[in-house]
Amino acid sequence: YGLVGSEMCIRDSVEGARQAADNGDLLMGTIDTWLIWKLTDGKRHVTDYTNASRTLLFNIHTMQWDSDLLELFTIPETMMPELLPCDAVFGETTVGGLFKNPIVIAGVLGDSHGALAGQMCFEEGLGKVTYGTGSSVMVNIGEKAAVAPRGLFTSIGFAALGKIFYAFEG
């Protein structure tokens, strides 16, 4: 969680990074952004709403990068990946020429969010519990964001079929 700290550390400690950011020559993103960037040979700089919601820079109500937060942390919006719903087409890959015909990259979700969809929690009130390296409880709260009860936070559950599904998570 929280891409901001890593980005600030890079800009402050890597020689030339701050200038590259100011010039529009430095990009940032989440793990899906990097994977898609590599798979598309640098053609696509994108992320989905669920991964973006983990950056501390994404507004879950507008589905956009939060300009106030970007300004607060002095992050140029040009560094940020394009935002897409989970069921969008994110690009194409031949996996470095391994395949003759391109394979479409269609569908991206963050891990807990993917588990919510994978457990078919498509209706309000359905949830999942995941235990692994970390643990996560996530419950679909429907298409309207709500203030989470104490100890939980409101997040994007997933975005598909033109709809945004919110979730409580803890």
Model-derived features: positions:
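A residue-level structural signature of the nucleotidyltransferase/glycosyltransferase Rossmann-like core
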Residues: 1, 26-28, 128
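Enzymes and membrane/adaptor proteins characterized by extended Gly/Ser/Thr/Asp/Glu-rich
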Residues: 41-51
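ATP-dependent carbohydrate kinase catalytic cores
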Residues: 50-161
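Single conserved hydrophobic/aromatic residue that forms the stacking wall/gate
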Residues: 1-5, 9
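Hydrophobic transmembrane-helix microenvironments that flank and shape a buried ionizable site
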Residues: 4, 108-110, 166
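Glycine/Thr-rich phosphate-binding loops that ligate phosphate moieties of nucleotide
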Residues: 12-19, 25, 29, 33, ...
